[in-house]
């Protein structure tokens, strides 16, 4: 992974969970783990975000929200599923309204499993996402030049 031309912006959404992974996401943003050393900026606006960080499983009620956030993001974009619930539905997998992991609604690029997912795994997933984002950005630029 080379040097980024801009700081990657991350939007976080809790689909539905026990909030254990959300606490770990907050821990990853704290000075103890210093995720900002990678230039990562947290945003609440999907139009500004490069990385979509999702915790929790997708259910009948929130699947449209997950899709809307994803659709509002500008290309190139990367999705990181954080926690067992986001990866596969987790402990809520057999509930009546749970569809499953995030990949049942949108394409997922990086999986960071764990219950609750550790801040180190979240940071590792985001760093992997940065590499994928760089590749997608190069492919998008090449496609624009070729068009």
Regions found by a protein language model. Give the residues of each.
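Iron-sulfur-associated redox domains of electron-transfer enzymes in respiratory
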Residues: 1-147
């Amino acid at each position: 992974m080379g040097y980024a031309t801009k700081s990657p912006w991350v939007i976080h959404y809790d689909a539905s969970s026990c909030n254990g992974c959300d606490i770990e996401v907050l821990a990853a943003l704290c000075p103890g783990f210093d995720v900002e050393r990678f230039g990562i900026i947290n945003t609440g606006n999907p139009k500004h975000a490069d990385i979509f960080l999702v915790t929790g499983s997708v259910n009948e009620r929130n699947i449209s929200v997950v899709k809307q956030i994803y659709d509002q993001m500008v290309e190139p974009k990367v999705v990181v599923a954080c926690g067992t619930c986001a990866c596969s539905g987790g402990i809520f997998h057999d509930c009546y309204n749970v569809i499953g992991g995030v990949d049942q609604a949108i394409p997922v690029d990086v999986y960071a499993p764990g219950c609750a997912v550790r801040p180190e795994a979240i940071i590792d997933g985001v760093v992997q996402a940065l590499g994928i984002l760089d590749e997608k950005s190069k492919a998008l630029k090449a496609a624009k030049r070729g068009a």
